[in-house]
């Protein structure tokens, strides 16, 4: 593309960098934990439905946290009950899928993490043997501590994301 457009990088003037997506939300931080994707998504669902950001306990869906292989919860947002499941490991995902097929269970939203406990136990993490529950809990709690300290707790609070929606996509939802 550069050759085609005859752009010579050496002759370009220095300028500031494009900070697009240079900031993140704490919702992205908790993606590393089992239930973190669900929790971040539920925060956004709350924002979309109420047109305001969640506060207090609505920022911390503790019922879906932890390292259990299968977690279920019913979350009430805007008078609507949402049945959710969080699954750790593909073996348990297979079991839950079979239950869904057999109409034994129903969920509105399911999060599946291949690594038990979430990415905190994944291949990209420092390997400590044995990787026990205590270590997983410490990693998980560190991410939740970081989440709690941040000012931008929902993706839609991120000024870069707001700019993208304002200028390209329109309203979220």
Each PLM stretch: what is its role?
Residues 1-173:
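Iron-sulfur-associated redox domains of electron-transfer enzymes in respiratory
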């Amino acid at each position: 593309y550069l050759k085609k457009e005859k752009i010579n990088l050496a002759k370009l003037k220095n300028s500031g960098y494009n900070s697009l997506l240079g900031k993140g939300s704490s919702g992205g931080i908790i993606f590393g934990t089992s239930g973190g994707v669900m929790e971040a998504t539920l925060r956004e669902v709350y924002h979309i439905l109420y047109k305001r950001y969640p506060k207090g306990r609505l920022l911390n869906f503790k019922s879906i946290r932890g390292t259990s292989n299968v977690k279920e919860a019913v979350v009430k947002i805007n008078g609507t009950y949402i049945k959710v499941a969080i699954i750790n490991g593909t073996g348990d995902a297979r079991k839950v899928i079979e239950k869904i097929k057999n109409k034994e269970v129903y969920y509105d939203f399911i999060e599946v993490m291949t690594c038990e406990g979430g990415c905190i136990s994944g291949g990209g993490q420092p390997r400590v043997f044995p990787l026990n529950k205590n270590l997983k809990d410490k990693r998980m709690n560190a991410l939740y501590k970081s989440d709690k300290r941040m000012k931008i707790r929902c993706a839609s609070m991120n000024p870069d994301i707001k700019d993208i929606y304002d200028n390209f996509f329109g309203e979220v939802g």
